[in-house]
């Protein structure tokens, strides 16, 4: 896990131009940053380098401009958010490469921080064009990647440049990689995984990878219905991908071969309409009526799943157990998340969670701060769970 270098290895950076890849792809409302979480994540790295006298040059993308300049996707729009979080003025350089970028960098002094323009304004970014990576490398002396959320992309600012300059992991990247290694790379066993969400089709590769790595696989959300159907359960009007029953059976077989126990709900909360607080029934999975939908895991199954977690030492969580955005179908997700949080607080469980819906669910349960690590990385977290190589990480190991 120490195959990559961190800021501990970077040496004297006084007066050095350090290109730092960060995640500034933040949500905006009425022209202002509405959630600065991603900016805040990069602050320890930015401050550390600035305090050590580096010239800190921030590289990032914003939106999907598809290789063309678009003023509605300029990083100038997020400057207010960056300055608010950092607590002082930051220079904006309206180019990322070329003479304009070089001129902007030339006026900076040690300790200064600047944001370069959206890297995706250049076709060479997403194409990982060697010429674009060369042009980026011309304006820096060192490279730091602090954007795990973009590490699954082989782009010029994540992969190409890391092979042209001395490359290091920033503090946020370092924390993420250590947490992920503790969860699946070299975990304390037994290991449990919670995988939820609406569709099996979006998580097939995750499930196939996990059955070979974890001891207990807890499947929830709409995707559990497909697995129940594969076991011969009539799930009524529930969301169910009947065309993937064979895939579900293949995953059952792979789990059996690997010694992984798959846990499905055996009691469920059903309703005839998917709406807030409708009339509901809690029934055995074999008692779902033809006009009912499964919308959450039932109380007996929640208790059994809590017992599974109590006997595990490591947990990876991706996706809610029920339709958590719509009460009362948040009950199972909240209850199991609070169990995991309590076990983490008492020191018996290492808990790592990730994915947009997962973060929202843990925040809803009020326990995101109690998990060992919560990743906001989305696609990169999912590809890591699938066991796929992450080009931005691999480039740091070169």
Curated annotation (Swiss-Prot):
PROSITE patterns: PGLYCERATE_KINASE (PS00111). The keyword ATP-binding applies. The keyword Amino-acid biosynthesis does not apply. It catalyses: (2R)-3-phosphoglycerate + ATP = (2R)-3-phospho-glyceroyl phosphate + ADP. It comes from the Bacteria. It is found in: Cytoplasm. Pathway: Carbohydrate degradation; glycolysis; pyruvate from D-glyceraldehyde 3-phosphate: step 2/5. Keywords: ATP-binding, Cytoplasm, Glycolysis, Kinase, Nucleotide-binding, Transferase. Its EC number is 2.7.2.3. Monomer. Belongs to the phosphoglycerate kinase family. This is Phosphoglycerate kinase. It comes from Sphingopyxis alaskensis (strain DSM 13593 / LMG 18877 / RB2256). The lineage of its organism: Bacteria, Pseudomonadati, Pseudomonadota, Alphaproteobacteria, Sphingomonadales.
